[in-house]
Amino acid sequence: IADEWEHSTNERRMFRVIASLYAQLDLGEIYKPLKGLRYRLNFGPDFRYRRNGTFRDKESTSSQGQNHASNANNSNVSWTLDNLIYYNREFGQHSLGLTLLESATKYRKENASLAANGIPYEPSMWNALDKSQISQLADWSTDLVERQLLSYMVRLNYGFADKYLLTVSGRWDGASQLAEGHKWAFFPSAALGWNINQEDFLKDVNWISQLKLRRNAFGSDPSSRNPKTF
């Protein structure tokens, strides 16, 4: 029985670059009437490349008397870009917070693989899969997956005396993987909060540091559906 370890080679390589970048601008520091207004930019790129090369010489029990080689390449590129505007102010016992968001996400994955028999020059292994040099093309495939998501969001927070809280938001999501005519959807949400520990009848109760009652109502996000495959 031939030793397969001596007659086969498998090499995998991977390269990845991932980052999280942001920039922020306090407009109130530049122009006093805009106190409480801030702008923030978030950018998160992610790049991955993988290559898997396999070679089995003609002495391998699975090569059927021919040198066999395969080469598979995979690249993934994705990024997310967020534009955010914040506005926060207090007026006496009233507090107001406004958040505006525009977010774009893109994902792209490409796959390509090739396998052949009859490699004439063994040291080249999977690096010379030229149709003029090989005797038989055994297998090949290509694949492309893409998806995009674009979102807009508005959120309003209101508080009174640090006791009673209201949050109202609306989000518009557009997803490329959804069917034509159904790519965009609106998702509203609302929440009421009550900081009970701030009430006079609990202020002297030392063993309660925080007690909050919250009620939410919100929609769902369909953008997690399968991406489009070409």
Task: Give residue spans per PLM region.
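Extracellular loop and loop/strand-boundary signature of outer-membrane beta-barrel proteins
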Residues: E4-N10, Q64-A72, A138-T142, D173-A179
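Residues that define the transmembrane beta-barrel architecture of outer-membrane proteins
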Residues: R13-A19, V77-L81, Q148-Y152, H182-P188, ...
